[in-house]
């Protein structure tokens, strides 16, 4: 379905679905510290506002999220990154931890928030570079984080044969290996990772 209607991503039903799946697949650590990649500024703002009105089932409190885009100042970005990395016991009246940052136009590269334990992709891309950059936001090791959960609601990994190749870990670029990997559907990624 190349012509999916991405405007439906902000519907209440879709928001509930995203939250249900994010809760089901979970995260490593004491609390979620997630990045959500969106298609537009409007989408980040609407989704953040809707999440902030919903109770996080893991902790019984409203989600705390923020929408960030290219118009945010460097100070606003740094503040958001610090809040995302915070634990509950570090909260104070001035700063509360964030559960998610909704992002468009930024965070693909050059950002290092090692505590990120969940990445949600709501943005379509045909670019294996952008896909791997977004995926990579959660791949850094951190104390208390054993793994990262990547939820690709768009199915970017199926849209471009270069993405499964990038995920395969095979750097030989042997045509027979690539053909076999693509024909198998890349269901199992090397290591302890799977695609569902």
What is the predicted role of each segment?
Residues 1-38:
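Conserved interdomain linker/interface between the two RecA-like ATPase lobes of SF2 helicase motors
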Residues 43-50, 109, 130:
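Phosphate- and divalent-cation-binding pockets in alpha/beta enzyme and binding domains
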Residues 60-64, 114-118, 126, 143-150:
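Short glycine-/polar-rich loops that comprise or flank the Walker A/P-loop
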